[in-house]
Amino acid sequence: MAATFFGEVVKAPCRAGTEDEEEEEEGRRETPEDREVRLQLARKREVRLLRRQTKTSLEVSLLEKYPCSKFIIAIGNNAVAFLSSFVMNSGVWEEVGCAKLWNEWCRTTDTTHLSSTEAFCVFYHLKSNPSVFLCQCSCYVAEDQQYQWLEKVFGSCPRKNMQITILTCRHVTDYKTSESTGSLPSPFLRALKTQNFKDSACCPLLEQPNIVHDLPAAVLSYCQVWKIPAILYLCYTDVMKLDLITVEAFKPILSTRSLKGLVKNIPQSTEILKKLMTTNEIQSNIYT
């Protein structure tokens, strides 16, 4: 193409660039075999909510099937151990379902016989007050599975007359502060709540520019969008494996309205926690 006036910059056609684009286009074309592999992987990564006893899928979302006024979600081993010791041992809880999922870090293929070291995601309600729900989730829910998890649990149009409490942990090195993280009294709690959550938190609120991650962030964002009162308690710790001091760092939450009345005997619960830690140490010891 010739220039039409002096000084005009003319781009000469480049065949090499065209060939590269054609090769990229061919690479993007999906073969029937590729499509089949992709569909199989998508089916494998599908999140399913099951009745644990019958292994059949729930026809509707969990909270559409059961009315809920209070929902406590523990995500990660230390948060799960806290609920197991202080909440579940203070009342009679009935299992209503479990999540089955598969990803790079989680294989919840068999949830019938679980030990404290296995990954799982199980839902319960309190027999004396069935509108109080609890979720223990020690498995990793991948980014592409989080929306599925929310849909299966909350549904597409959730009720707003319930309160959500989320407990989880992050490593203290994820905490952004002008101070040295080595000088921080680890473990420590921070809270983040939705606009509709009006109760006071039992610890300082999470400071900017700190952010939350993974499933806890997805649940809190979902609650913010749907105007559901929700609060996330985040324990920053330097020990991410099951740890007595980290679990006990959640204790201030026992005085909040969300958990008040669910814990009857704190000294007894502390003893149960110590037994749980001892059992876990024995199971984790390769020499026993």
From Swiss-Prot:
The modification N-acetylalanine is found at residue 2. Degraded by the proteasome upon completion of 20S proteasome maturation. In the adult, detected in brain, colon, leukocytes, breast and testis. Widely expressed in the fetus. Also expressed in a variety of proliferating cell lines. The modification Phosphothreonine is found at residues 18, 54. Forms a heterodimer with PSMG2. The PSMG1-PSMG2 heterodimer interacts directly with the PSMA5 and PSMA7 proteasome alpha subunits. It is found in: Cytoplasm; Endoplasmic reticulum. GO terms for molecular function: molecular adaptor activity; proteasome binding. Residues 26-35 have a biased composition (Basic and acidic residues). GO terms for cellular component: cytoplasm; cytosol; endoplasmic reticulum; Golgi apparatus; nucleoplasm; nucleus; protein folding chaperone complex. Belongs to the PSMG1 family. The keyword Transcription regulation does not apply. The modification N6-acetyllysine is found at residue 264. GO terms for biological process: cerebellar granule cell precursor proliferation; chaperone-mediated protein complex assembly; proteasome core complex assembly. Pfam families: PAC1. Its main location: cytoplasm. This is Proteasome assembly chaperone 1. InterPro entries: Proteasome_assmbl_chp_1. Residues 13-35 are annotated as: Disordered. The modification Phosphoserine is found at residue 180. PANTHER family: PROTEASOME ASSEMBLY CHAPERONE 1 (PTHR15069:SF1). The keyword Endoplasmic reticulum applies. The gene is PSMG1.
